From Swiss-Prot:
ATP binds at G9, S10, G44, R48, T139, Y145, D148. Its main location: cytoplasm. The gene is pyrH. One of its GO terms (biological process) is UDP biosynthetic process. This is Uridylate kinase. UMP binds at G43, D65, T113, E114, P115, A116, H117, S118, T119. The lineage of its organism: Archaea, Methanobacteriati, Methanobacteriota, Methanomada group, Methanobacteria. Catalyzes the reversible phosphorylation of UMP to UDP. Homohexamer. One of its GO terms (molecular function) is UMP kinase activity.
Amino acid sequence: MKIVVAIGGSILLKEYDCKKFQEYSEILKSLASEHEIFVVVGGGKPAREYIGVVRELGAGEAQCDDIGIEVTRINAKLLLSALGDAAYQKVPHNFQEALEYSATGKIIVMGGTEPAHSTDAVSAILAEYIHADKLINLTSVDGMYDKDPNKYEDAKLIKEITASEMIEFISGKDTKAGTYEFFDMTAIQMIKRSSLETVIANGYDSENLIKAINGEEVGTKVISK
């Protein structure tokens, strides 16, 4: 299968060390023996902190986005370092480059691409662009909830949801740079338009990636309706 994996920066950089990079590199290398793997890495806390600084300096949202994109590309380079020869050692800056680099048969790792697109959106657009079979989004919670699980103890995990229902749920949410708490609208629209099989799961347990690819019950499954 051709698979796009989105990994939140907060997953890889929670402790600001190399452990998660090493952990994921081993799993990705194993998966690459059977699948064509593309990875999109988020910015996480470092991106939010830098964006906060530049916003205080009076920068507009487009400039804030640019800062965030640069951080995602640094994170991508860190994962490339962990992957070594198993990955193409250059970060694509756009979808065409990602497709071209994939001709090497190696794992492709990228970050953001342009202002106003979160890495969730980038992963969904990339999946459509390369005609991926599956999109796996690894985040800091167990999947999609009916409300913020970090704020509400009674938040319930949604095991299955349609893309149309997600669009209704997300409508009106904040979309400032660095504030994406879940999928943004562009990502969901891409999933719906391309009928893309998507799973959202907790990335702190890297084994969830394997479960999602194997079709086991994990996280939230998004149905492209």
